[in-house]
Amino acid sequence: TIDLEHQLNQSMKNKEIFTLLGLEKSLVYFTTSLKANKIVIQKLMRNSTFLKMYEDDQDLLEDVLIENKQAIEMAEIYSHILSGMMNTFSSVI
């Protein structure tokens, strides 16, 4: 996003705005997918009685859930940053 920000500073054309829109759209899809994965991981952890899981498997699932939550947070942060950049540049244009 830093390179894109520099490009926007140099030339405020529609091309850069559409690039931002594409990035924002991708982040929405990415966040939605991560949230769906979180639900699946949580269900796997709850249904460990039906699935034979060893302690290492349970630990691995917990680690995966933590990483997934961090990825959701990062995607949401970048989405907010992109929204702010788009609002700023649209008000300038």
Give names to the regions the model predicted.
Residues I2-I93:
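Membrane-associated alpha-helical segments
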